Amino acid sequence: MATLISLNDANRMLIAESQEDFLQIACYDWISTANKAIQKRGAFYVALSGGKTPLQIFQEIVKKRAAISDCSKIFVFWGDERASEDTEAGSNYLKAMDILKWLRIPDTQIFRMDTANPKGDEIYENLIREHVPDTIFDMVMLGVGEDGHTLSLFPGTAALEEKDRLVVFNEVPQLQTRRMTLTFPIVRQARHLVAYIQGTAKQDLCHKLLHPLGRDTFPIERVGTPLNPLQWVLSSDCCRAADLADIPAECKLEMF
């Protein structure tokens, strides 16, 4: 079903054998994390990722929503959002809620980023501080771009070095825009950190992730820590056979 690879103390990769396995693993992990949080603490606080892959995962979650113990205990936030002028065409919020609406999460527990407001980042940080106990999310979902960015933490941008703020507007020169994003300080303290990669378009990225020497560190590689590792879920088509063969046997574990 999957191969577990321990890259280092801060990163653990689970490579699914098929696209179906990839979605099943991601869905099971999400629902299991939600149910454990609801059972232990009475609620599930999650920060969602944008991108195409999470939308597929959301579809699987909706199909299996009967397995969620109590959808009324879910509190939904976003990890990042596009500039206001792109909202209608590419809003992470709109795309996600078009699917997740079937979970019937109370509207008062769905927190959208307002990128049109110049102080939207401060407002969103205050919402997190008000509603998320100790500002610790139960789960933060992360996508990964071909340049190694995650959320809207792009290579070479100022938000990568933010030490105090939980949410900021980040200027992204390579896209000629700015985006609102969570920062490392709040992401790293989440109880469960998980990144998703799938598709042949990410093969070069995966090659670099598996061969980190001689290059700059990607933003996504700065998320996990030895005390709170980042769990990766990958589809088999994003990893070349030759790259997997390079991994020492003692770092791999076949799982069924």
Curated annotation (Swiss-Prot):
What the entry lists under CDD domains is as follows:
6PGL
**What GO molecular function terms would the record report?**
6-phosphogluconolactonase activity
BP GO terms, sorted = carbohydrate metabolic process; pentose-phosphate shunt
Q: Which UniProt keywords apply?
A: Hydrolase
Q: Give any Pfam family that matches.
A: Glucosamine_iso
UniProt cross-references to NCBIfam families, sorted A to Z: pgl
- Name of the protein in question: 6-phosphogluconolactonase
